[in-house]
Amino acid sequence: MVNWFRRRKKRVVVPRLHTRGETPAAVNKVDLAELTPTLEPYLAQAAYLQLTIFETLSSALVTAPSTESKEAVSRAASFSLAKHHGLVAELARKGVDAAEAMKPYAARIDDYRRRTLGANWHETMVTAYVTAGLLDDFYRTLASGLPAEPARRIAEVLDTEDGHELIMGELKRAIENDPKLASKLAMWGRRLVGDTLLIARSALAMPADGHSEEARLEPVFTELVAAHTRRMDALGLTA
C-alpha cells in the first residue's frame, strides 16, 4: 500500500517509508535515468543543494562547542563547497552562468533549508549528515541519465570526500557525553527524511501525467532510505 504526502494545489509525492522488516508490494521499479532532467537543470539544482549543505555546516561552525569541533566542521563544509565548485565548473563548460541557472530553484531549496536547519547545534549536524547522504546518493543515481562524458565527470565530483566521517565522529562524541541526545536526534533524523525526499523528487523530469510513475518510484526511494538507515545505524540511532 502506498501512502503519498499531498500539498494543496500542487501534488507532491513521496513514497511511504517502510518499517524495518516490512516488505513492500512488488512493483516495476522505474529507472531514474528515464526521469533525469537535462544537463543544465540537473547541474543547477545539484550545485545549489551542495551550496545549501555548505551553508548548513557553516551555521554549525559558528556554534560548535570546541576548537576541535570547529576544525572538523570546517573541513566537512569545505568538501561540500568543493562539490559545489565542481558542479559549477560543469555549467561553465556549457557557457552557462551558474548564478542565473540556479535562480529558478533557489527559493524552493532555501525554504527546504530553513525547514530542516534544526533548533540547535546537534540537530544542525544531523541535518548535514542526513541530507548530504540522501542527496548525494540521489544525484549520483540520477546522473546515469545524463550524456556519458558529463555524467562521468559529475560522478567523480560526487564521489569525492564528503565529510560524513567527520560529522559522524562529532555526533558520536556528543551522544557519548549525553546519552539522552540519542532519542531526540533519532526523531529529528526521521523528520528530515520526508522533506529531503520531497526536494529530491522535485528534481525529476516527470511526465505531464506522472501518476503512473508514482508507484514505480517507491522502490527507488526505498533504496535511498535503506542507505540512510545504514548511516543512522552507524551513529547508533534508529532511523
Residue locations for each model-derived region?
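Short, extreme N-terminal leader segments that mark the start of a protein/domain
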Residues: 1-69, 73
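Charged, well-structured binding/catalytic surfaces in domain cores that contact anionic ligands
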Residues: 143-179, 183
